[in-house]
Swiss-Prot record:
Membrane topology of the entry: Peripheral membrane protein
Subunit structure: The complex is composed of two ATP-binding proteins (UgpC), two transmembrane proteins (UgpA and UgpE) and a solute-binding protein (UgpB).
Job description of the protein: Part of the ABC transporter complex UgpBAEC involved in sn-glycerol-3-phosphate (G3P) import. Responsible for energy coupling to the transport system.
One Gene Ontology cellular component annotation held by this UniProt entry: ATP-binding cassette (ABC) transporter complex, substrate-binding subunit-containing
Name by which UniProt lists this protein: sn-glycerol-3-phosphate import ATP-binding protein UgpC
UniProt-annotated binding residues for ATP: 37-44
PANTHER family found in the cross-reference section: MALTODEXTRIN IMPORT ATP-BINDING PROTEIN MSMX, SN-GLYCEROL-3-PHOSPHATE IMPORT ATP-BINDING PROTEIN UGPC
Family: Belongs to the ABC transporter superfamily. sn-glycerol-3-phosphate importer (TC 3.A.1.1.3) family.
Catalysed reaction equations from the record: sn-glycerol 3-phosphate(out) + ATP + H2O = sn-glycerol 3-phosphate(in) + ADP + phosphate + H(+)
Organism of this sequence: Rhizobium meliloti (strain 1021)
Length: 349
């Protein structure tokens, strides 16, 4: 196990295309960090730089007490789990697990001990003599994780390992990965574009945008106190509603105390914090009339997609099956404590 430290790391392609812009990050020993952001934000590039698969243009990366800028991947004491499993198709599961250890001249007894331990923890003991083509997608991903575990590395690096699995398997494997990481206590860096996956796995989230860090914090910190409008809309599903004060607030009303902050340009409200007006307790409130455009039933709740009088979209949640009709007008409200405020640059006020 080890700490991982990045100091002012940059990555530039062809001299002027900046993929990573001055990233600094300290990852504690045993911590599970998730790098999350939209496509092209630099999360996979950053992971590959930690792994040594991608060179850095400037800055410093340390694993434990060693600066690893000039070290090969095999010298960094890390193990990586890829999106495409990267299993040898002509080898059995047992051979896939042992291959890297044999190349490092690990004693046979130690190889068998590590394989037995990993196979038991991952529940792949019945499959040790099968080849990858005889396994399901979830079983292959477990084998890929097992190959990383038997290395007993200082850190695990995960590059979107669940993206090839169906929704049910993704949930199962999320739980499995978190359980294993806690049991092993190994420092882990995980890349995903799926904010739900990020929220459920991470000790801390690192939200990237355009090669820069937007915010670092626990999932609940980022959800409840997003530092920027970008983080506010990226973390949470459906996204936070952002209402632009520059378009005029004739479509909604709120006490002056809620909208009179100096520099205020945008108000944010999460869909789950909006209720039908009659369901909201008293006190200072945001209120608006919404024309219903669509209703999504997602089981125990529904999401209503509508528009305000000025054309701005608004999404809100209602319990159970909504009886609202398309083009119906309803009044909604939100209490003062649920509002978020951002300036013209998208920074939290």
């Amino acid at each position: 196990m080890a700490t991982i430290t990045l100091k002012d790391v940059h990555k530039t392609y062809h001299g002027d295309i900046a993929a990573i812009r001055g990233v600094s990050l300290a990852i504690a020993d045993g911590e599970f960090i998730v790098l999350v952001g939209p496509s092209g934000c630099g999360k996979s590039t950053l992971l590959r730089m930690i792994a040594g698969l991608e060179s850095i243009t400037s800055g410093e990366i340390s694993i434990g007490d060693r600066v690893v800028n000039g070290l090969e991947p095999s010298e960094r004491d890390i193990a990586m789990v890829f999106q495409n499993y990267a299993l040898y198709p002509h080898m059995t599961v047992r051979q896939n697990l042992s291959y890297g250890l044999k190349n490092r001249n690990t004693p046979k007894e130690e190889i068998e001990r590590r394989i037995a331990k990993a196979a038991k923890s991952l529940e792949i003991e019945p499959f040790l003599d099968r080849k990858p083509r005889q396994l399901s997608g979830g079983q292959r991903q477990r084998v890929a994780m097992g190959r990383a575990i038997v290395r007993e590395p200082a850190a695990f690096l995960f590059d979107e390992p669940l993206s090839n699995l169906d929704a049910k398997l993704r949930v199962q494997m999320r739980v499995e990965i978190k359980r294993l990481q806690r049991a092993l206590g190994t420092t882990s860096v995980y890349v995903t574009h799926d904010q739900l996956e990020a929220m459920t796995l991470a000790d801390r989230l690192v939200v990237l945008n355009g090669g820069r860090i937007e915010q670092v914090g626990t999932p609940i910190e980022l959800y409840e106190n997003p530092a920027t409008a970008f983080v506010a809309t990226f973390i949470g599903s459906p996204s936070m509603n952002l209402l632009d004060l520059n378009t005029g607030n004739a479509a909604w009303s709120a006490p002056a105390a809620l909208v009179g902050k100096p520099g205020l340009a945008t108000i944010g409200i999460r869909p789950e914090d909006i209720t039908l007006a009659g369901d909201t307790d008293g006190g200072e409130r945001f209120r608006a009339r919404v024309r219903v455009g669509a209703v999504e039933l997602v089981g125990a709740e529904s999401y209503v997609h509508g528009t305000l009088a000025n054309g701005e979209p608004l999404v809100f949640r209602v319990a159970g099956r909504s009886r609202m009709m398309i083009d119906e007008e309803v009044e909604v409200a939100a209490v003062a404590g649920s509002l978020h405020w951002f300036d013209a640059a998208g920074r939290r006020l």
